[in-house]
UniProtKB/Swiss-Prot annotation:
Source superkingdom: Bacteria
Similarity comment text for this entry: Belongs to the succinate/malate CoA ligase beta subunit family.
Record GO terms (molecular function): ATP binding; magnesium ion binding; succinate-CoA ligase (ADP-forming) activity; succinate-CoA ligase (GDP-forming) activity
Gene that produces this protein: sucC
Role summary: Succinyl-CoA synthetase functions in the citric acid cycle (TCA), coupling the hydrolysis of succinyl-CoA to the synthesis of either ATP or GTP and thus represents the only step of substrate-level phosphorylation in the TCA. The beta subunit provides nucleotide specificity of the enzyme and binds the substrate succinate, while the binding sites for coenzyme A and phosphate are found in the alpha subunit.
Pfam families in UniProt: ATP-grasp_2 (PF08442), Ligase_CoA (PF00549)
GO biological process, one term: tricarboxylic acid cycle
Binding site for ATP: 46, 53-55, 109, 112, 117
Binding site for substrate: 274, 331-333
PANTHER family: SUCCINATE--COA LIGASE [GDP-FORMING] SUBUNIT BETA, MITOCHONDRIAL (PTHR11815:SF10), SUCCINYL-COA SYNTHETASE BETA CHAIN (PTHR11815)
Name the record gives this protein: Succinate--CoA ligase [ADP-forming] subunit beta
GO cellular component: cytosol; succinate-CoA ligase complex
Subunit structure: Heterotetramer of two alpha and two beta subunits.
């Protein structure tokens, strides 16, 4: 689960992290009052969406020369002007896809005099099975680009869960970031605070980009991105209360009600598969044959007929879907259950696009028999390669 920047900063501030003063607003009418609550004279007006690249993003409704989703303002009047232009419009960034996200809230924050921009994140490093800090002196830019072009500028420090952040860890981190004086002292206080927040709140990612050193030598969390482990949310009612469902895909929300693993993508071939590995392989082979998957959808190993029906309905509700591939390898999941669920869904919502079904495993003959006797216009496939070729050909020929 993701939260907005202003929520992440409030959470980190509650642990003692240094963040600037700021006010979240939901309408342009609140902008002037928000600015008056801050010291000024420099303000930052930040679009609050669950996506990165806001500063370089562009609003669909505005001209090509319009400023992006993060703007500087030198007066309260300028804050108001930015708010009126940004709220309600659609911000397109490298992470939103071409459809973008509507900006429904802004964060008005006190400006900062920046001397250096650094990068810091905390995540689970699965290669060592520990929580790890990832830091770089190259802050304020895409860490992926740094990793690609200058990987030597990224330092990873795994934290022993029994010891927490030790003095040796702090020495390694502060030296990697080339910190000294007050900035180093601030970092030695901040890093254990961030680690504590990460662990106590069951985060899956805590990213501060940039973490800045100001001209006065002090450190500040200038931006914050926080994601939480969805499997641990039952322990954190306060975190669940921060959820903004308007930032989530409606189909993903609907899928979660039925315990379906669904992720919306930008392609036009809907996929219904059992097992995450097989689902990823299915998406890969669709791309191999020149098409793009519209979703990742794993119905799991013990899905019922009703669950399969809902999964199929979620796929068909996506107007971008021009064809559907059902790829099932039955183990715990029985092929006849899949067949019954697909047929029930088609009878309820209709079938307006090509449908390719590949079944293998437990009760496969019964599953095929159910589909063949259903009277539906279903294209059968013998294996994954055959299925991918058939659905791509059917969509391109439609």
């Amino acid at each position: 689960m993701n939260i907005h920047e202003y929520q992440a900063k409030a959470l980190l501030k509650s642990y003692g992290a240094p963040v600037a003063e700021g006010v979240a607003i939901f309408s342009a009418d609140e902008a002037a009052a928000a600015a008056k609550k801050l010291p000024g004279p420099l303000y930052v007006v930040k679009s609050q969406i669950h996506a990165g690249g806001r500063g370089k993003g562009k609003f669909k409704e505005l001209g090509a020369d319009a400023k992006g989703g993060v703007r500087l303002a030198k007066s309260a009047d300028e804050v108001v002007a930015h708010a009126r232009e940004m709220l309600g419009n659609t911000l397109v960034t490298k992470q939103t896809g071409p459809s973008g996200k509507q900006v429904n809230r802004l964060y008005i924050e006190d400006g900062a005099d920046i001397d250096r921009e650094l990068y810091l994140s905390i995540l689970v490093d699965r290669s060592v099975g520990q929580v790890a800090f990832v830091v770089s002196t190259e802050g304020g830019m895409d860490i992926e680009a740094v990793a690609e072009h200058t990987p030597e500028k990224i330092v990873t420090v795994a934290i022993d869960p029994d010891k927490g952040v030790t003095a040796d860890d702090l020495k390694t981190l502060t030296e990697a970031l080339k910190l000294d004086g007050e900035a180093r002292a601030d970092a030695e206080k901040l890093f254990p605070i961030l680690y504590k927040a990460f662990v106590e709140k069951d985060m899956s990612l805590l990213e501060v980009n940039p973490l800045i050193v100001m001209t006065n030598g002090r450190m500040r969390v200038l931006d914050a991105k926080v994601s939480f482990d969805g499997n641990a949310l039952f322990r954190h009612e306060d975190v669940v209360a921060l959820r903004d469902t308007t930032e989530e895909d409606e189909k993903e929300i609907e899928a979660s009600k039925y315990d379906l693993a669904y992720v919306a993508l930008d392609g036009n071939i809907g996929c219904m598969v059992n097992g995450a590995g097989l689902a990823m392989a299915t998406m890969d082979i669709i791309k191999l044959y020149g098409a793009e998957p519209a979703n990742f959808l794993d119905v799991g190993g013990g899905a019922s007929k009703e669950k399969v029906t809902q999964a199929f309905k979620i796929i068909t509700a996506d107007p971008a879907v021009k064809g559907i591939l059902v790829n099932i390898f039955g183990g715990i999941m029985k092929c006849d259950v899949i067949a019954e669920g697909v047929i029930a869904a088609v009878k309820e919502v209709g079938l307006k696009v090509p449908l390719v079904v590949r079944l293998e495993g437990t009760n496969v003959e019964l599953g095929k028999k159910i589909i063949n006797e259903s009277g539906l216009n279903v294209i059968s496939a013998d294996d994954l390669d055959d299925a991918a070729q058939k659905i791509v050909a059917a969509v391109k020929g439609a």
